[in-house]
Amino acid sequence: FLGLANKGNYTIVASVNGDTGDMLEFQYRHLLKKLGFETDFRTLDGKSYIGVVSGGKAVFEKTGDEQLTENLSLYGGKISVTITSGGAVTGQPVARIIADGKEYAPNGSGINFAVFDNKLQKIVAAQSYDTSVYTYTYKGTDAFYGEILIEE
């Protein structure tokens, strides 16, 4: 999913629910770096995390011991995004990615992603990965626009 997202012209929003886990293998850490995320997810130790990357570069990243909420805009204000992360240390694990008033994050344990197509300037997919286990189980990919197909 993320490997394919890396091959296109996408903006990726990430929010952590609970813990990213220290089981994140090198190949996945490397892929996240290639996508533009600068934070080493293994070192979060249950902290909250919000990140936005576009074109292989970090646009916004924030970590904290408290629940985080950020209101950001994409595409020159065309899309309003509210991102919430509750790491394990907050006692309130949650991941929310709301674009123009609609919830897109699967709110699964681990790292939640929402992918926006930069050409269409619309959300195209969302998925969460439970990185606290080696199988990296994911909640099914939600694709929002049929003309854009991101498959595993």
Predicted features, each with a name:
Residues F1-E152:
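Short acidic-hydrophobic catalytic motif
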